[in-house]
Amino acid sequence: MNREEQLGVLESLLFAAGDAGLSTEQLTEVMEITHIEALNLLELLSERYNGNEDRGLILLELAGTFQLATKKAHAEFLRKLVEVPSNTVLSQASLETLAIIAYRQPVTRMEVDEVRGVQTDGPIRTLVAKGLVTDKGRVDGAGRAKLYVTTSEFLDAFGLNSLDDLPKLADPEAEDPDQSEMDLFFDRFNQSKEQEEE
C-alpha cells in the first residue's frame, strides 16, 4: 500500500472505532505497520484535519487513543441536526442499545457490543445526541473506555420516576435474560407512546 492508501485505511479504522478510539498498538497490529509508521500516519492525518479550517473533523488524542471528532465551530449545526421532536421513533438498534444501558449501567460500549453481538457506536451516538444517554467517567486501566448511563431525559421520555421503576425481569435465571430485558423495555416504550397519542 502506498501512503495515501494507508491514510485511507487509517481514516476508515478511526471512523469505525468511534468514541472508543484506537491506540497505536491497535493500528500497528491491524495495519501491519511499525509503531513509527503509525505515528507518522497519525501526524499526517492530523495535519490534514486539524490544519484545514474547512474540514469538519479533527483528530484527537485522548487517554492514549486517537479518535475523530467534530469541530466545536460546527456545534450549532450539529445541535440542529439532533434536536428531534419527542414523538420521533428510535430505531430497533437504538432501542436495544438503550435497554442494555438502562439495565446494566454504568456500562462501556464494548460491553453493550458483547450483549448485542454487533457494534453499537452508531446507536450510542444517536442516544447521546438525543439526550437519553450520557457518558459518566471512564473505566480504569488500558483504553479508559467511557462508561454510559441513562439521563433524566430518559426517565421523562419513558414516564419513569427513577430507575427503580424499570420493569423487573420476569425470570432472572432465564437462558436469555438480555432478550427479556429488551422485550420488557420495548413493551414499556410502546405503552408510553400509546399514552402520548391518546
Swiss-Prot record:
Keyword Cell division appears in the UniProt entry: yes
Location of region: Disordered: 167-198
GO biological processes: cell division; chromosome separation; DNA replication
Family annotation (Pfam families): SMC_ScpB (PF04079)
Location(s) in or outside the cell: Cytoplasm
Acidic residues biased stretches: 172-181
Xref: InterPro entries: ScpB_csome_segregation, WH-like_DNA-bd_sf, WH_DNA-bd_sf
Domain of life: Bacteria
Family: Belongs to the ScpB family.
Protein role: Participates in chromosomal partition during cell division. May act via the formation of a condensin-like complex containing Smc and ScpA that pull DNA away from mid-cell into both cell halves.
Subunit field text: Homodimer. Homodimerization may be required to stabilize the binding of ScpA to the Smc head domains. Component of a cohesin-like complex composed of ScpA, ScpB and the Smc homodimer, in which ScpA and ScpB bind to the head domain of Smc. The presence of the three proteins is required for the association of the complex with DNA.
Name the UniProt record assigns to this protein: Segregation and condensation protein B
Organism: Listeria innocua serovar 6a (strain ATCC BAA-680 / CLIP 11262)
Originating gene: scpB
